[in-house]
C-alpha cells in the first residue's frame, strides 16, 4: 500500500490508538507489522477474527491475558545453551501458565455454546505443557525469586540460614541492650562485608575482641564482629554459599527442562500475542462504535453514516459515501471550509482500516472495496527545502499517481487544479479526471471550480456532489450531498453580515444570470433532498421498530407454543402414569376373578365383559409425544369410514365391522358376538378379511373369516397345557362370534376327553356340547354350542 497515503491519512494514529490496549510484547510486534492488504482471502480471515474478538469482548469482556514480556531473547539464549536466570524463567513460566488458562477459557466458551468463526481453530495450535508449567510455577515467584518449594535441599539450607540469623541477633542483642551498650556509638546491628557487626567507639575496641571490618569516616567508630559471633557468621556465610549453589543448580535444571520445547513455547507466545492484538481490535471497535464491514471484490463501496475515526465523536459528522456501483468518480464542488477535505479523508481512512482487518466507524451493513492501492493528494505536502510551490508540488503528486494507478486503485484528490490561473486550472482538472477515468480508477476529488459542475453531468460513471450549507444560519452542516453540485453562498453571507443592500444588489447584477439561476436550482434541490433524507430516515426507523417488534412477538409466540406443548406432554405423562397404575390393579382383579371362577366352577362375570373392560382401560393410554399425536390426528381425519368396512379397533387389538355411525366421534362396531360403541380415533381401516393372508399355527388352523379356526386340535398336548389352551380358545371363539366350535381331543386314555367335558360342564357360557357324529370323529372330538 502507498506509504505516502498512510502518512497523509494519519494511519499511524490508528495504530497508536490500538497500542494503548495491548498487554503483551508479542502483540506489540504484530501491531508494528499491521498494514492494509489487497488479498481478499487474508482480509476475510482478519475480519472473521475481529468478529470473534468483538463477540468475546461483548459476552466475556475479552480473552483473559496478563502482561506478557518479550521472551524471544530468552529463547535465543536457551538455543545458545546458556542457563536462564530466575526472571527470564518466570517470564516464560507466565507464558506457559497463560497458555493453559486461554485453552480452558475457549473450552468454556464451547460448553456455553458460543459460536466462533475462526478463533476456536486458532486456539488448537496452542501446546500446553502441564508438567513443565507446574514445575516452573512451584519453583519461581513472579519476580524470578526461587521459592523454598524448588527443592528439599534449598528449603533445608534456608531453614539453617534463618536459625543462624536468629542466633546471631540474639547474641548481638546482648551487646546492644546489655551493660556493654554504653561502649557503642549506636545501639544497632549492621552488616559489613556480608557479616553482622556492631558500631564500637574506637577507644573501646579491645573490650569486645573479634574482627574489625570497617571504620567511620572520622575514625571514631569501628565496625567490629565480636569474637562471640565469629563462628556463627562463618556458619551463616557457608549456608549462604550453599544456598547460591543450590539456586544455580535449580536454575540449570529448569533451563534444561525447557530445552526440548523451544519451538512450542515461541509459538505459544506468538499466538497469545495474536489474541492480545484481537482483544485490542475489539476494544478499539467498541470505543469507536465500529461495525464489521462487508467486502466487495467488485469495489462497490457503500459506507453508511461513516465517521472520521480521529475526530472527537461528539463533534464528528457522519456521512453516507457510495462509489463503484452507479458511478466511479465523485466531483465534490463548492466553496472551502465546508468539510470537503474531511469527507475525502474519511473515505480513504475508513477504507484503509477495513483493509487492515479492523472494524470501521460506520453503521451496520457498510461495504468496503478491496483496492490494490489507495492514492491521495491532500494539502500542501511539499518540503520547504525543495522550495516547491503549492501548484508544483500538487502536480508532482498527480503525475506520480497517474503513473501508478490502475482499475483497482482508489484516488482521493483535494482541490484538484488549485494554485494556478482558474481557467487553466479548471481545464487541467478536467483533463486529469479524464485520464483517471481512462485508467479505470475510482476517484473522489474536490474542487471549487464551477466548470467542473457540468463535467459531472456530461461524463459517464461520474456524479456531482457538494457539502450542505444551511441558508438560515449561513453555516456549513458538513453533510455530503451526492447528486447535487455545490453553489456559491458569498452574496448571501455578505448580506447576512450587514453588507449594504445596494452593494449586494450591484454584485448580483454583475453576476451572470445563468449562474444565479443555477444557484437557485441547486438551493431548491438541496432543500428537496433534505426533506427526502428526513423521510427516508423516519421510514428506516419505523421499519427497524417493526422488525424488532416482529422479532419480539415471534419469540413470545415460540415460548408460548413450547410452554403449551410442555404442559400437554406433562399432563399426558401424568395421565399415563395413572392409567398404568389402574391397569395393573384391574389386571390383578381380573386375574383373581378368573382364579375364583375356575375354582368355583362357574363364572360370576362374563369373560367377554372382562375383555371389554380391559380394552376400554387400554384405550385411556395417551401417546406422550405430542407432535406424533398431531400427525396421527391429521392422518385419521383423512380416513373415510363407511358402514360395512372392516376396521381394526386399536385399543382391543381386534378386527370388527362398522355397523352404524352413532355421531361425529363414535361408531357402533360388531366384534364377534359383541356390538360396541367405539371412538372414531380408535379405528383404523383393516385389510379385507377375504384378502388377508393365512397364518397357520402348529395345532390351530386360522380361518379366513374371523382370524381364528373353528376347530381346536389338542392331540399331542399334555393335560395341563391342553386345559389352558381350551380356556383361551373358548374366550377367543366367543369374542369372534362363533355359534359353535369343535374340540379334537382324541380317544387315547380318555383323560383329555374327560378334562374337556368337565370344563364345559362348569362354563355357564356353553349352551350344549356332545361328541361329533361317527363319520366326523365320534367320541374323539366334541362339538360345543354357545349361548
From Swiss-Prot:
Smr domain sequence ranges: 712-787
Pfam family, one: MutS_V
Keyword Acetylation: no
Chain spans, region Disordered: 685-709
MF (Gene Ontology): ATP binding; ATP hydrolysis activity; ATP-dependent DNA damage sensor activity; endonuclease activity; mismatched DNA binding; ribosomal large subunit binding; rRNA binding
GO terms of biological process kind: mismatch repair; negative regulation of DNA recombination; rescue of stalled ribosome
Classification via InterPro entries: DNA_mismatch_repair_MutS_C (IPR000432), DNA_mismatch_repair_MutS_core (IPR007696), DNA_mismatch_repair_MutS_sf (IPR036187), MSSS (IPR046893), MutS (IPR045076), MutS2 (IPR005747), P-loop_NTPase (IPR027417), Smr_dom (IPR002625)
UniProt keyword Hydrolase, yes or no: yes
Residues noted as binding ATP in the record, renumbered to the chain: 334-341
Disulfide bond annotation, renumbered to this chain: none
Catalytic activity, EC: 3.1.-.-, 3.6.4.-
Alphabetical list of HAMAP family matching this protein: MutS2 (MF_00092)
Function statement: Endonuclease that is involved in the suppression of homologous recombination and thus may have a key role in the control of bacterial genetic diversity.
PANTHER family per UniProt: OS10G0509000 PROTEIN (PTHR48466:SF2), OS10G0509000 PROTEIN-RELATED (PTHR48466)
Family matches, as NCBIfam families: mutS2 (TIGR01069)
Protein family according to the UniProt entry: Belongs to the DNA mismatch repair MutS family. MutS2 subfamily.
Assembly notes: Homodimer. Binds to stalled ribosomes, contacting rRNA.
Designated name of the protein: Endonuclease MutS2
Protein source organism: Levilactobacillus brevis (strain ATCC 367 / BCRC 12310 / CIP 105137 / JCM 1170 / LMG 11437 / NCIMB 947 / NCTC 947)
